[in-house]
Amino acid sequence: MERIKELRNLMSQSRTREILTKTTVDHMAIIKKYTSGRQEKNPSLRMKWMMAMKYPITADKRITEMVPERNEQGQTLWSKMXDAGSDRVMVSPLAVTWWNRNGPVTSTVHYPKVYKTYFDKVERLKHGTFGPVHFRNQVKIRRRVDINPGHADLSAKEAQDVIMEVVFPNEVGARILTSESQLTITKEKKEELQDCKISPLMVAYMLERELVRKTRFLPVAGGTSSVYIEVLHLTQGTCWEQMYTPGGEVRNDDIDQSLIIAARNIVRRAAVSADPLASLLEMCHSTQIGGTRMVDILRQNPTEEQAVDICKAAMGLRISSSFSFGGFTFKRTSGSSIKREEEVLTGNLQTLKIRVHEGYEEFTMVGKRATAILRKATRRLVQLIVSGRDEQSIAEAIIVAMVFSQEDCMIKAVRGDLNFVNRANQRLNPMHQLLRHFQKDAKVLFQNWGIEHIDNVMGMVGVLPDMTPSTEMSMRGIRVSKMGVDEYSSTERVVVSIDRFLRVRDQRGNVLLSPEEVSETHGTERLTITYSSSMMWEINGPESVLVNTYQWIIRNWETVKIQWSQNPTMLYNKMEFEPFQSLVPKAIRGQYSGFVRTLFQQMRDVLGTFDTTQIIKLLPFAAAPPKQSRMQFSSLTVNVRGSGMRILVRGNSPVFNYNKTTKRLTILGKDAGTLIEDPDESTSGVESAVLRGFLILGKEDRRYGPALSINELSNLAKGEKANVLIGQGDVVLVMKRKRDSSILTDSQTATKRIRMAIN
């Protein structure tokens, strides 16, 4: 009570009130605020008052031996006073100037190597061209972009191991460098940075920039590759944009771009083969992009594109949980639905079986040139807010949303029959049938959709069936907005499954991707894509198929030859001959095949008629299912260069030309490699030389396994027996001699014995 009275008394004095309200009372709290913790609370102020002092810097004692006490102007560079609390010296900023001008010069050779990303950036900017500035409304949408040009694509963990190995090789800790790229980079960097005096920490930071992809979720209108993102602040503002052409490409952008092209080509090709999934995997594993295996790139590269994601799903990698329809990426932001099969009638009274999504859901739709927010109920579009670069792009988004809504008026707007097929000539599923139909012509769809009066809402306008904007009326539920819809920002990846026909589903069975979603756009890859798979020979046209088929036979001639004589059917069914069939006129394929197979059988039966060049030349024709006929051919036709060209059964032609003296084979004038004929096929004498050191025992004996080629004989142990294939496609049984002394006589006896064994 006493205290309260005392306080009241104090408060009655005007001075007390002033002290309490106007002056800082608890100095301790403020002092604490600015002195506790190592974090500087007001860095710029601190810098200013420190630099106002005479000796604001502390330096190692050695500085006194390396820097004079005064400079040329007589100003003191360091103080004799020791720094309180450490054994360092107090130094003036002038000492730094002196050091920069007169200090020792170390080697600069490592700077461009360590700071490579900066030097490269300067070069790109130097050679880049900046165009005019345009003032206009910018529709920016946030996208996940790569902010770090010129990086490799290592994971954070892989990069960490490389950095530790390069910068701190003697530190303890297990480092496992497994991938091809890790080993190459480590070796390269160790050589580059020998005797490097730059601080290891700095080197580590810079290496990280070079090795790891850094992404940010940034508002972008325009180019999204890293060489555009590095100048984002120069090329687009809120109401202006400046044209810019980068002064150089970087490998990471090239890889992203080439990966998309390779993946699209592979998915398109796999979709039309007998077993799409197996074919896709075979192609992914045998393709290289810029010299790196495609599967390695897929494992490391986070690019999200329909074809790339299908390839990743096939390899068992996780992908984004968003799904694709009509070239737009859909991400459900709220609501849920259950699926039910329903039969609907089109305007042409065709019955379609569609999977209806029952329930209220909201989605974001993000495409290349347009974005939208879609709210839908069961078979009803509630609202669609679209923004896009131009009328065309906005129309594309509206069509996709209308089809996706599964509304009845959309299905009734179909005129004519729906019979679209995919590349493999299979009918598309109903949703894609509808989509294709309206993408061709959406006039009826827009006319029948219905129109409503609209309220005036800032930043939104209506759009009429002819795609003209309006402030009074709009197609029902549809508005065009100035603002873009951001891409889905999460980098979360989910486990998915893929079926034989390349349909990718999430764990709840929703289809996320299918080959129908893969873009038909064809670009030119910036890095060389090498498809080793025979399935991709067609990509460069008929000539490439022809050359590749014959090159394949020549490269594998040793094994092909054995199969030709022992297991021809297996040889004819090889997938490498599949592309060739498209060059042979359909009507006559079967007859050609029957004719060639009969010819080959005669060669096997009649001694001395084995002819390497002829077998190679005619082999691809034998791959088609044969038709039995008595027809004989002197030439076979292939469709290349837009017309039928002839391959002569006996002799050379412009399509297939073998030069006996140079042993070179040219296909359509292109070199297809060296063809080593079996040692002088007209006489059997040369075989004897090859079979030196072997005793010929007689005819082929199946118990000793399949026939080896002459080259494979060297692997036999002394005394071991084997069947061997000799020049004319004949097989004999031989034994490797136990003693080398008798080798000389082999040549003479071999010739006699071969003849006896065969006859």
Curated annotation (Swiss-Prot):
A GO BP annotation: symbiont-mediated suppression of host gene expression
Keywords assigned: Cap snatching, Eukaryotic host gene expression shutoff by virus, Eukaryotic host transcription shutoff by virus, Host gene expression shutoff by virus, Host mitochondrion, Host nucleus, Host-virus interaction, Inhibition of host innate immune response by virus, Inhibition of host MAVS by virus, Inhibition of host RLR pathway by virus, Inhibition of host RNA polymerase II by virus, mRNA capping, mRNA processing, Viral immunoevasion, Viral transcription, Virion
Single GO molecular function: RNA binding
Site residues, Mammalian adaptation: 627
Motif stretch (Nuclear localization signal): 736-739
GO cellular component: host cell mitochondrion; host cell nucleus; virion component
Subcellular location: Virion; Host nucleus; Host mitochondrion
Keyword NAD: no
Family in the record: Belongs to the influenza viruses PB2 family.
Quaternary structure note: Influenza RNA polymerase is composed of three subunits: PB1, PB2 and PA. Interacts (via N-terminus) with PB1 (via C-terminus). Interacts with nucleoprotein NP (via N-terminus). Interacts (via N-terminus) with host MAVS (via N-terminus); this interaction inhibits host innate immune response.
Cited function: Plays an essential role in transcription initiation and cap-stealing mechanism, in which cellular capped pre-mRNAs are used to generate primers for viral transcription. Recognizes and binds the 7-methylguanosine-containing cap of the target pre-RNA which is subsequently cleaved after 10-13 nucleotides by the viral protein PA. Plays a role in the initiation of the viral genome replication and modulates the activity of the ribonucleoprotein (RNP) complex.
Name of the featured protein: Polymerase basic protein 2
Annotated source species: Influenza A virus (strain A/Beijing/39/1975 H3N2)
